[in-house]
Amino acid sequence: MKKADILVLDFGSQYTQLIARRLREQGVYAEILPFNVSLADIKAKEPKGIILSGGPASVYATDAYFCDKGIFDLGLPILGICYGMQLMAHHYKATVAPAGHKEYGKANIEVKKDSALFKNLPKKQTVWMSHSDKVENLPQGFEVLATSENSPFCVFGNEDKKFFALQFHPEVQHSEFGKNILKNFAKYACNCESVWNMGSFAKTQAEKIREEVGSDKVLCAVSGGVDSSVVAALLASAIKEQVIVVFVDNGLLRSGEKEQVEFMFKNTLGIDLISIDASEIFLSRLANVRDPEQKRKIIGNTFIEVFEEEAKKHKDVKYLAQGTLYTDIIESSVVGASKTIKSHHNVGGLPEKMNLKLIEPLKEIFKDEVRALGLELGLSKEVVYRHPFPGPGLAIRIMGEVNRPSLELLRKADVILLEELKSTGWYDKTWQAFCVLLNIKSVGVMGDNRTYDNAVCIRVVDASDGMTATFSHLPYEVLENISRRIINEVEGINRVVYDISSKPPATIEWE
């Protein structure tokens, strides 16, 4: 079992993933586990500290989430955040009740006592609150470390036990020194060293792959995106002669994608590539399917079938490698009390029975860590910084049924969007950019004639790890040129709209 410096117990907060991400940025390996993980599993991880995340429940409610009480007797430093703070207070017999004044948004705190958390930090700070309950009295043995206008017990702790509790969320960017607070907890309370990096990760994963695979062969599924490219490079660094890299044209790719992928692997990466045209089978199975979850599961099942057929042609193939990321695992609701957002074609969308064992060497890291790993493995910046492209491809960028005419419309619009972003220098400034073909038509006027054609939506977002995202503030003239070109050059589209929603509440992809 992989060891972790700090374990984050997930009580259902939308920010739980950010806690782990912020710690990893400091070189500390943090791992997220369900709130009800067993004490034995916690001990097996040999952590140096534990963090209790926030969550939507109330500790006094009948449906409250509780972890094993034994964690408070392990002798490990513990940091409670929001719900985790209230859980700690509740455990030590303090009263937690509904707050008369709920706090959502920015607040100012003032540090009242020096502690490991606030070492070398200002006395006054801006933080991010998101709570509707409050701690009414201080737990016995604890003392106040910081206050806010509405929270006299905003931060409290027991320095001897190294237990700390925060009413605010240090993991979000709005908390001015939140990242420093988490770093201080790891460094001064838990005695963690900053040794986690992609160099050490690559070495560990290569050893793990060799140990798990032995002399067997591995089919590596690639799409041309950064995730699968990094997986292929990592496998090649560990067991090059045992890796069979397979690219499947599922008919759901962007314009020119197949040719780009084949060139990249054979010429840029120096990796032999088997290319399979399975577009007919994918598109036939997607016919008349409109539900996005069904699309994902059909695509996931069909991918596996295609790979299993290819595996039969090669002796000793026992494994299938995929570029599943930590964000995929999280959004498919594998950990904690979080709700399922959507199944990913390479997680929840997979069939229950597989004749190949699955190997996912990136499933413990975030997108920006994948990019860093790619550079560590020698991949070019051109490959590493390509915009993310989903496994289900254009199928989840077409609202409703997927068919060849719709795919052709979407491809043409997408080419124009990317051309304009690259020519204006905006492509490299953004996290992801694509078009969505909406399942609606609208009235227009072109050349004095009435039109009734398709609408397309432009989605361009800024992000660092894909867990949260904001829409990109593209200049109006750039948007205008994109819209004008799509409407003039793509027959069948007469309206272009821009998606200005952020994640959360929206996801980056529409389906």
From Swiss-Prot:
It catalyses: XMP + L-glutamine + ATP + H2O = GMP + L-glutamate + AMP + diphosphate + 2 H(+). ATP binds at S223, G224, G225, V226, D227, S228, S229. Pfam families: GATase (PF00117), GMP_synt_C (PF00958), NAD_synthase (PF02540). GO terms for cellular component: cytosol. GO terms for molecular function: ATP binding; GMP synthase activity. It is an enzyme of class 6 (ligase). The active site is at C82 (nucleophile), H169, E171. InterPro entries: Class_I_gatase-like, GATASE, GMP_synth_C, GMP_synth_GATase, GMP_synthase, GMPS_ATP_PPase_dom, NAD/GMP_synthase, Rossmann-like_a/b/a_fold. Residues 5-195 form the Glutamine amidotransferase type-1 domain. Pathway: Purine metabolism; GMP biosynthesis; GMP from XMP (L-Gln route): step 1/1. Keywords: ATP-binding, Glutamine amidotransferase, GMP biosynthesis, Ligase, Nucleotide-binding, Purine biosynthesis. Its EC number is 6.3.5.2. Residues 196-386 form the GMPS ATP-PPase domain. PANTHER family: GMP SYNTHASE [GLUTAMINE-HYDROLYZING] (PTHR11922:SF2), GMP SYNTHASE-RELATED (PTHR11922). HAMAP family: GMP_synthase. Catalyzes the synthesis of GMP from XMP. Homodimer. This is GMP synthase [glutamine-hydrolyzing]. It comes from Campylobacter jejuni subsp. jejuni serotype O:6 (strain 81116 / NCTC 11828).
